[in-house]
Amino acid sequence: MTATLERRESASIWGRFCDWVTSTENRLYIGWFGVLMIPTLLTATSVFIIAFIAAPPVDIDGIREPVSGSLLYGNNIISGAIIPTSAAIGLHFYPIWEAASVDEWLYNGGPYELIVLHFLLGVACYMGREWELSYRLGMRPWIAVAYSAPVAAATAVFLIYPIGQGSFSDGMPLGISGTFNFMIVFQAEHNILMHPFHMLGVAGVFGGSLFSAMHGSLVTSSLIRETTENESANAGYKFGQEEETYNIVAAHGYFGRLIFQYASFNNSRSLHFFLAAWPVVGIWFTALGISTMAFNLNGFNFNQSVVDSQGRVINTWADIINRANLGMEVMHERNAHNFPLDLAAVEAPAVNG
């Protein structure tokens, strides 16, 4: 008896939609995470472009002193930004329908909240989509794990830090100069340069760049030549070939002699795990540092740690940084405060009378 097996056609529109969403044959994989990622990222991108070009000034400090951020209001690509939502709004959810008018929503910086919340949803779904595609193809899940580092960093500066500080106005502005302003004020208020988690992040980013350049140059310099001297060595490579494209033994030997034997990897898996893990772990730590400093667990304070036998302070570099921090702190939000928060935290002297 012969049984003929035919591919079962999905009877419903929903079934065909499910097949299309989860198909790995599409030019760009959609996936269930993509169903949420696409509209959220499109919304964030569209509103960002419109607001960067045409948004009116925003009362970021809640003191009726609007700050201009868009191109049509006098900025250029370097100085322009999406200004964070007003301190008058704080952490309140502020969609358009919560404002009395669109003009009020724009004046209070509503676009910033809209962009940031859609963006964070979108990049989280992008990470989930990476895992989903890996799962469909039978791959291991580490691509999504690596991408979790920049997702954690973005979540820290756009969501965790504003929550800790009590207002979206403390979030990072969406622009070049605004990012620098955020970094300077963050240093002034939290001494991030003296935080060990930030130091680990610097080692991760710079070390990752160094290791990436070293690896790429070693591989490119030790290609297995399949061509004549008159042709490029690149022409001998076929995409998907089973044979190795470079000689890891030669690269290992070169690097081992350049520095010392055990500074070089002779195992390709160990090498590539290290290349991935170093920057990812560093950025994880930085995101964790931002998230703790959000709640004012700040960098180390070594101010006035060294004194002479008479009790006079001998300045160290920590004191120089502290002086710079005070200068930056008194200059930012200059009309919102009459004195820096460091002085405001000191208890006022008792007055008798």
Swiss-Prot record:
<keyword id="KW-0934">Plastid</keyword>
<keyword id="KW-0472">Membrane</keyword>
<feature type="binding site">
    <location>
        <position position="215"/>
    </location>
    <ligand>
        <name>a quinone</name>
    </ligand>
</feature>
<feature type="transmembrane region" description="Helical">
    <location>
        <begin position="29"/>
        <end position="46"/>
    </location>
</feature>
<keyword id="KW-0560">Oxidoreductase</keyword>
<dbReference type="Pfam" id="PF00124">
    <property type="entry name" value="Photo_RC"/>
</dbReference>
<dbReference type="GO" id="GO:0009535">
    <property type="term" value="C:chloroplast thylakoid membrane"/>
</dbReference>
<dbReference type="GO" id="GO:0016168">
    <property type="term" value="F:chlorophyll binding"/>
</dbReference>
<feature type="site" description="Cleavage; by CTPA">
    <location>
        <begin position="344"/>
        <end position="345"/>
    </location>
</feature>
<feature type="binding site">
    <location>
        <position position="215"/>
    </location>
    <ligand>
        <name>Fe cation</name>
    </ligand>
</feature>
<keyword id="KW-0106">Calcium</keyword>
<dbReference type="InterPro" id="IPR055265">
    <property type="entry name" value="Photo_RC_L/M_CS"/>
</dbReference>
<keyword id="KW-0148">Chlorophyll</keyword>
<feature type="binding site" description="axial binding residue">
    <location>
        <position position="198"/>
    </location>
    <ligand>
        <name>chlorophyll a PD1</name>
    </ligand>
</feature>
<keyword id="KW-0479">Metal-binding</keyword>
<comment type="similarity">
    <text>Belongs to the reaction center PufL/M/PsbA/D family.</text>
</comment>
<dbReference type="GO" id="GO:0045156">
    <property type="term" value="F:electron transporter, transferring electrons within the cyclic electron transport pathway of photosynthesis activity"/>
</dbReference>
<keyword id="KW-1133">Transmembrane helix</keyword>
<dbReference type="GO" id="GO:0010242">
    <property type="term" value="F:oxygen evolving activity"/>
</dbReference>
<feature type="transmembrane region" description="Helical">
    <location>
        <begin position="142"/>
        <end position="156"/>
    </location>
</feature>
<dbReference type="InterPro" id="IPR000484">
    <property type="entry name" value="Photo_RC_L/M"/>
</dbReference>
<keyword id="KW-0460">Magnesium</keyword>
<protein>
    <recommendedName>
        <fullName>Photosystem II protein D1</fullName>
        <ecNumber>1.10.3.9</ecNumber>
    </recommendedName>
</protein>
<dbReference type="GO" id="GO:0009523">
    <property type="term" value="C:photosystem II"/>
</dbReference>
<feature type="transmembrane region" description="Helical">
    <location>
        <begin position="274"/>
        <end position="288"/>
    </location>
</feature>
<dbReference type="GO" id="GO:0009635">
    <property type="term" value="P:response to herbicide"/>
</dbReference>
<feature type="binding site">
    <location>
        <position position="272"/>
    </location>
    <ligand>
        <name>Fe cation</name>
    </ligand>
</feature>
<feature type="binding site">
    <location>
        <position position="332"/>
    </location>
    <ligand>
        <name>[CaMn4O5] cluster</name>
    </ligand>
</feature>
<keyword id="KW-0793">Thylakoid</keyword>
<feature type="transmembrane region" description="Helical">
    <location>
        <begin position="118"/>
        <end position="133"/>
    </location>
</feature>
<keyword id="KW-0464">Manganese</keyword>
<feature type="binding site">
    <location>
        <position position="342"/>
    </location>
    <ligand>
        <name>[CaMn4O5] cluster</name>
    </ligand>
</feature>
<dbReference type="InterPro" id="IPR036854">
    <property type="entry name" value="Photo_II_D1/D2_sf"/>
</dbReference>
<keyword id="KW-0813">Transport</keyword>
<keyword id="KW-0812">Transmembrane</keyword>
<feature type="modified residue" description="Phosphothreonine">
    <location>
        <position position="2"/>
    </location>
</feature>
<feature type="propeptide">
    <location>
        <begin position="345"/>
        <end position="353"/>
    </location>
</feature>
<feature type="binding site">
    <location>
        <position position="344"/>
    </location>
    <ligand>
        <name>[CaMn4O5] cluster</name>
    </ligand>
</feature>
<feature type="binding site">
    <location>
        <position position="333"/>
    </location>
    <ligand>
        <name>[CaMn4O5] cluster</name>
    </ligand>
</feature>
<keyword id="KW-0359">Herbicide resistance</keyword>
<keyword id="KW-0157">Chromophore</keyword>
<keyword id="KW-0249">Electron transport</keyword>
